[in-house]
A protein has these predicted regions:
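Residues on the lipid-exposed face of transmembrane beta-strands in outer-membrane beta-barrel proteins
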Residues: 115-119, 129, 200-204, 218, ...
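Transmembrane beta-strands of outer-membrane beta-barrel pores
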Residues: 39-45, 131-137, 197, 206, ...
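Outer membrane beta-barrel transmembrane domains
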Residues: 52-71, 151-160, 164-176, 273-405
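Outer-membrane beta-barrel biogenesis signature
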Residues: 19-97, 364-373
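Residues that define the transmembrane beta-barrel architecture of outer-membrane proteins
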Residues: 108-113, 193-198, 212, 238-244, ...
Length: 405
């Protein structure tokens, strides 16, 4: 029963948390401080682009059909029931037994808020640090559909108490009982808030001449968020990671107030050690607790190429739009027991196409003209992952307020 693939499918979701804004080449003047506050919402992660690139609801993509074959693998009592039914007459009644389809529907939603502080070390070099506060909610429901259980109840109810119990199986209840028996946490709704991975950013202007700017940005993700939990199928499990993102961005004006910013970036994940349940084989979708071991995890690196366009409507208002394409390498796991570590990285390579839009209000120029009280910037961004492979459909919205002093 592939609940892990269904519920823990948010890999990469938070890798760019608090980084929904369009890439630019702006740095702070020397000695200028800029506290800011970001608030964002990420929706759409209840859908996923599959290995074929098709967009599917996770409830449809990972529904489990409980026919006789799957029941026998799932529960030893069910196998005995099937064998017993096969002995009634000559019609293979047990092999035709079907408890229907178990749907695990999820409604995950992530909100984040992040105080960020940046300072201009020189006119070319700016550093900053951000602390994301994550709010994660997920409404989880299990439902049973398309069962032929009523026919079997009519035919065989009352013959045997144990048979009656089997015929009255509640898949939702049985699922959580099975998970608990294997040491997993029950599938319940989630509503939790925690500190995510702290990010430290450095941006340096490598070149600046005639309104043409080339910048290098390094972003370090520190593993301050929750650690990987092998017993929680509904956990995000995308925090507690160390990685470094290196980016190059170039900007220049095209015509009048229209400018462009092409960029490339490469995220390097640092290997770490986590405790994981290692499947015994391809059919072992719910590994037992005794399969847990400390493994070395090397998450796939991510390469991104993209471009943005900005148009300055007035000295105070600007709009922008952009597109980027990213590709992630497959993950890799190693350990000392020599088991099927490759199964931990199944379908972990991914690609994504994303579009963004942004509108910004700035009072900075008005402040220097003595027509604004304080220098600030307020921006609103939206982004959408409109195509991909092995990645969640992510629709993000972010509001950003920046002050300067």
């Amino acid at each position: 029963m592939n609940f892990r693939a269904l519920l823990v499918t948010f890999c990469g979701l938070m890798s760019s948390i608090c980084a929904q804004a369009l890439m630019s080449t702006s740095t702070l003047p020397e000695g200028i401080n800029s506290p800011s506050f970001r608030f964002g919402i990420i929706d759409g992660i209840g859908q996923k682009y599959t290995e074929s690139g098709s967009l599917m609801n996770l409830g449809d993509y990972k529904s489990v059909v409980f026919d006789a074959k799957n029941l026998a693998k799932f529960n030893s009592d069910a196998k005995r029931l099937i064998d017993a039914l096969n002995r009634f007459g000559g019609h293979a009644l047990g092999d035709s037994f079907n408890l229907g389809v178990l749907r695990v529907d999820t409604m995950p939603r992530v909100q984040y808020s992040a105080p960020v502080f940046a300072r201009g070390i020189t006119n070319r070099w700016t550093v900053g640090v951000g602390v994301p506060i994550i709010s994660y909610t997920n409404k989880i429901s299990l439902s049973q559909e398309f069962s032929n259980i009523e026919y079997y109840r009519q035919q065989f109810s009352g013959l045997n108490p144990e048979l009656d119990d089997a015929l009255n199986t509640d898949l939702s209840k049985a699922t959580n009982e099975t998970l608990t028996g294997k040491g997993y946490k029950a599938l319940n709704n989630r509503d939790e808030t925690f500190v995510g991975d702290i990010q430290v950013v450095s941006m340096y202007k490598l070149y600046e001449k005639n309104e043409k700017v080339l910048t290098y940005q390094a972003q370090v993700n520190l593993p301050t968020g929750p650690k990987f939990d092998p017993d929680d199928l509904a956990s995000l499990n995308v925090f507690g990671r160390t990685n470094i993102t290196n980016s190059l961005a170039y900007s220049q004006y095209l015509i009048g107030r229209l400018s462009m910013v092409p960029y490339v970036s490469y995220l390097i994940n640092i290997p770490d050690t986590v405790t994981a349940r290692v499947p015994l084989n391809e059919d072992d979708t719910l590994p037992d607790a005794n399969t847990k071991e400390d493994v070395t995890r090397t998450l796939g690196n991510i390469a991104t190429v993209g471009g943005n366009l900005f148009y300055e409507i007035t000295d105070s208002w600007m709009v922008g739009g952009g597109y980027d394409y990213s590709t992630k390498d497959a993950d890799r796991y190693t350990g000392e027991r020599g088991t099927r570590y490759d199964l931990l990285a199944t379908n972990s390579a991914s690609t994504a196409h994303r579009v963004k839009a942004e509108i910004t209000y700035s009072s900075v120029k008005s402040y220097f003209k003595k027509t604004a009280v304080i220098p600030l910037m307020v921006s609103f961004q939206v982004s959408d992952t409109f195509s991909g492979v092995n990645i969640e459909r992510q629709t993000a919205q972010e509001m950003n307020l920046m002050l300067f002093f």
